[in-house]
């Protein structure tokens, strides 16, 4: 009887550990992006050095005004361009669009592609800081 109890306990522990591993994503990598505020994104831009800003809008929207140093990778091109233009999958990547919808889609796609440090901060319509044209 003690052996059966011991086996059941070991089985439950094993299943629990397996479940935790499955939830953490492939190889323990992040399985989601972090949503932050515009203020938090600005703080990162002011204090960090090693980050990339992705504008997930269209070329026309980008030309109307964008956050300084942002690179344009429209949300619908992330799959095709990320590997080439974003070779470091652990790089801090900040993502925005116009309202937040496309930046969420782009951030989800980046995570699916294996990027582990993605932060989405919504849309430029809520960006209270300077932009460049």
Regions found by a protein language model. Give the residues of each.
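Hydrophobic beta-strand scaffold positions of dinucleotide-using enzymes
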Residues: 53-55
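Non-catalytic accessory regions used for complex assembly or targeting
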Residues: 12-14
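Rhodanese-like catalytic fold shared by cysteine-dependent sulfurtransferases
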Residues: 2-8, 18-38, 44, 51, ...
């Amino acid at each position: 009887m003690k052996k059966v109890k011991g086996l059941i306990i070991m089985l439950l522990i094993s299943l629990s550990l397996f479940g935790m591993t499955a939830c953490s994503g492939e190889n323990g990598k992040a399985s989601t992006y972090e949503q932050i505020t515009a203020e938090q994104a600005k703080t990162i831009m002011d204090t960090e050095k090693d980050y990339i800003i992705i504008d997930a809008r269209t070329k026309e929207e980008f030309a109307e005004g964008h956050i300084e140093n942002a690179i344009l990778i429209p949300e619908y091109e992330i799959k095709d361009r990320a590997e080439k233009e974003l070779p470091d999958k652990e790089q801090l990547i900040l993502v925005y669009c116009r309202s937040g919808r496309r930046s969420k889609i782009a951030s989800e796609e980046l995570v699916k592609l294996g990027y582990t440090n993605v932060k989405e901060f919504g849309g430029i319509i809520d960006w209270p800081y300077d932009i460049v044209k």
